[in-house]
């Protein structure tokens, strides 16, 4: 039952995300409905990990995955595109500490929504017999008041299953590195 509640909560957040792009009328908050929040060159962000959901619900995976990392926007090679790098550590679904660095790109397809992918180089005792590995990690992000809520597909380490699950984390902007 608890697993179903988590899935419903995530679906509700994603569904209500479209409502968050509506204009907010308030004396305290400026109207930013026409503003695009593209991550600008040199911007640094703090990744706060999270949660995960898995396709095999009976496997007993750990779905509370605390962790921390940094995201850096290298450049904006074209309008709506950002080239970024990540370096993070988190407690993975198999109850081991996982580390990764990644290079990726994202495309902002709507005011608050972006889609992207990264090539990650990671290491955890849980995967690939503890040896470092490369993985292609696709994802989607929703930005609200400069906070970015990210969801990425967790790739499988075997050819039997293409997707293991979905991980959710947040990126908090720290300002410009320049």
PLM features per residue range, with description:
Residues 39-45, 63-67, 80-84, 98-100, ...:
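Outer-membrane beta-barrel architecture
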Residues 25, 33-42, 75-82, 108-115, ...:
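Short loop/turn motifs that connect adjacent beta-strands in outer-membrane beta-barrel proteins
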Residues 142-176:
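C-terminal or internal capping secondary-structure element at the end of a domain, subdomain, or sheet
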Residues 1-41, 177-178:
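Cleavable N-terminal export/targeting peptides
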Residues 50-52, 61-68, 162-178:
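Outer-membrane beta-barrel "beta-signal"
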Residues 46-54, 81-92, 114-125, 147-157:
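Transmembrane beta-strand segments that form the barrel wall of outer-membrane beta-barrel proteins
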Residues 68-74, 87, 101-107, 117-121, ...:
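Residues on the lipid-exposed face of transmembrane beta-strands in outer-membrane beta-barrel proteins
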């Amino acid at each position: 039952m608890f697993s179903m509640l988590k899935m419903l909560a995530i679906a509700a957040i994603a569904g209500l995300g479209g409502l968050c792009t509506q204009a907010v009328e308030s004396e305290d908050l400026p109207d930013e409905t026409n503003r695009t929040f593209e991550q600008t060159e040199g911007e640094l962000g703090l990744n706060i990990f999270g949660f995960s959901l898995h396709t095999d619900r009976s496997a007993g995976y750990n779905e509370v995955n605390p962790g921390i990392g940094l995201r850096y926007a290298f450049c904006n090679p074209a309008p709506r595109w950002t080239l970024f790098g990540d370096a993070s550590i988190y407690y993975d679904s198999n109850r081991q500490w996982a580390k990764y660095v990644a290079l990726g790109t994202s495309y902002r397809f709507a005011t608050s929504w972006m889609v992207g992918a990264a090539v990650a180089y990671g290491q955890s005792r849980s995967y690939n017999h503890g040896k470092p590995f490369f993985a292609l990690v696709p994802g989607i992000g929703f930005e609200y008041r400069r906070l970015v809520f990210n969801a990425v597909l967790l790739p499988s380490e075997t050819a039997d299953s293409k997707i293991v699950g979905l991980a959710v984390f947040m990126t908090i902007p720290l300002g410009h590195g320049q």
